[in-house]
């Protein structure tokens, strides 16, 4: 028998995997680092490399302000669930560059420009082009 996965750990893990999947949809590879350095994911697009911190909440946008000292992008994941079942296609991912984190309000309307929707290719590709530009996000 395996050890149980506590709900907060399951929520965070789902968020990290959803970010990886959404990024991969648009040609960005992302994976957790081998050692826990405080960054949840390292993402690659062409020659550009970015570190991501992922904050995940169920049925709301995370208000957690605890962030590591070094990261490039804050990924906020809003998991939608009904009766304990997560709907990945209805869940939302927002990629906020570190330079905008302090000024960004954590509500869906204010974060719209940072959303990485699975079904709006033009918006998602433009966002990723900005975040992974040679000069950095």
Language-model region placement:
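Mixed-charge (Asp/Glu-Lys/Arg
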Residues: 1-37, 43-137
């Amino acid at each position: 028998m395996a050890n149980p996965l506590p709900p907060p750990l399951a929520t965070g893990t789902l968020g990290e995997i959803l970010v990886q999947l959404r990024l991969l949809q648009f040609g960005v590879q992302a994976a957790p680092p081998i050692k826990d350095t405080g960054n949840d994911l390292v993402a690659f697009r062409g020659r550009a490399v970015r570190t991501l911190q992922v904050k995940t909440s169920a049925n709301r946008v995370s208000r957690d302000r605890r962030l590591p000292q070094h990261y490039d992008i804050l990924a906020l994941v809003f998991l939608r669930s009904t009766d304990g079942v997560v709907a990945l296609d209805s869940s939302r991912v927002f990629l906020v560059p570190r330079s905008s984190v302090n000024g960004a309000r954590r509500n869906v309307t204010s974060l719209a420009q940072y959303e990485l929707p699975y079904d709006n290719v033009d918006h998602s590709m433009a966002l990723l082009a900005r975040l992974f530009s040679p000069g950095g996000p």
